[in-house]
Amino acid sequence: MLRKRLQAGLCSLLLVLVLVFGPMERAIAFTDEQDLLLQAWRYVSQAYVDETFNHQNWWLIRQKFLKRPLKTRDEAYEAVGEMLALLDDPYTRLLRPEQYRSLKVSTSGELSGVGLQINVNPEVDVLEVILPLPGSPAEAAGIEAKDQILAIDGIDTRNIGLEEAAARMRGKKGSTVSLTVKSPKTDTVRTVKVTRDTIALNPVYDKLDEKNGEKVGYIRLNQFSANAKTEIIKSLNQLQKQGADRYVLDLRNNPGGLLQAGIEIARLWLDQETIVYTVNRQGIFESYSAVGQPLTDAPLVVLVNQATASASEILAGALQDNGRAMLVGEKTFGKGLIQSLFELPDGAGMAVTVAKYETPLHHDINKLGIMPDEVVPQEPIGYAMMGSETDLQYQAALDLLTQDQAIAQISQAS
């Protein structure tokens, strides 16, 4: 009898607990700003590559930030930014609506802006010019590689992220933007007004060259955009018709772009080999391989430098590790992390590091880069000089491609 009473009492207690606490949990209503914060938290919780979240209790971080009185959307964005900063991962970041749209546009094929490739120099934490695009307003304004962009329309670039800086330089065709530029060559600072124009993002430039009686096809890939593979195929077909039987693929100053574009372009050169391994948060490897016959098996040299990054390194690493090409130039940037884009309810977005990658020979190049087969140091040069007689790295590639011994080495490796 006592046992039955205890069981009945326990059931009553459980019922009271359910009645008291259940409705309270269901009654919690989050504001729109809290919902945005929660969605950002969930994306990281579900997809981030590091399950320790930089050795932190991610649930407690959620609770901490939910206690904030987030009254405006800007306050919500600031909270999300602070939350993501705790991961100590510069590639996992919030993209406000204009930044998110800008990032998607930059891989689509056309935009309106000043035509600068930019990056943040980690050594001095300053916005730095990789190169102005050929024929762009920035090039016409005299902006050069390695110039530092200190301010955009008076806004200090140290206080804004890379995407926001890019978004502020884009705008309606015919409008102007004021750039405060410091030249490391002369240590002078000047303010330049640049008129925005339509920037055609054709990611590929090609030409036929000749050395020692051999016809060499030169292909420069500036970015791994959605149309990059199609443009590479066009260039290869055109150069083959012109008689090219060996190639230089120029990946210098290519900051990367779409991972899938890098894999698809590697398949144009490889035959059944592994292109890249990705490693997720559980440590599970997934491989991407070439399928079918390559578009060409002609000898290939790839040019790389310190601004060759991300998807460019995937392609360069695949070609080098499989013995398909020799790399010439300087050690690459060393970005071996993969990000996915996630959209937030209000049109903002997030880039979240979801995996790391390794080359076919399982080299982890993050923060290490890829060392070329032949190191040729060279100061940064503009697009107009790339692939010219004064381009030392290009000339070294031509020498390799027109020497019988080097060609035999490349062909044997292939």
Swiss-Prot record:
The active site is at S310 (charge relay system), D321 (charge relay system), K335 (charge relay system). Its EC number is 3.4.21.102. One of its GO terms (cellular component) is plasma membrane-derived thylakoid lumen. It catalyses: The enzyme shows specific recognition of a C-terminal tripeptide, Xaa-Yaa-Zaa, in which Xaa is preferably Ala or Leu, Yaa is preferably Ala or Tyr, and Zaa is preferably Ala, but then cleaves at a variable distance from the C-terminus. A typical cleavage is -Ala-Ala-|-Arg-Ala-Ala-Lys-Glu-Asn-Tyr-Ala-Leu-Ala-Ala. Gene3D superfamilies: 2-enoyl-CoA Hydratase, Chain A, domain 1, 2.30.42.10, 3.30.750.44. It comes from the Bacteria. GO terms for molecular function: serine-type endopeptidase activity. It is found in: Cellular thylakoid lumen. Residues 100-184 form the PDZ domain. GO terms for biological process: proteolysis; signal transduction. InterPro entries: ClpP/crotonase-like_dom_sf (IPR029045), Cterm_S41_CtpA (IPR054621), PDZ (IPR001478), PDZ_sf (IPR036034), Peptidase_S41A (IPR004447), Tail-specific_protease (IPR005151). Keywords: Hydrolase, Protease, Serine protease, Signal, Thylakoid. PANTHER family: CARBOXY-TERMINAL PROCESSING PROTEASE CTPA, TAIL-SPECIFIC PROTEASE. Belongs to the peptidase S41A family. Cleavage of the 16 C-terminal residues from the D1 precursor of photosystem II (PSII). This proteolytic processing is necessary to allow the light-driven assembly of the oxygen-evolving cluster (a tetranuclear manganese), which is responsible for photosynthetic water oxidation. This is Carboxyl-terminal-processing protease. The gene is ctpA.
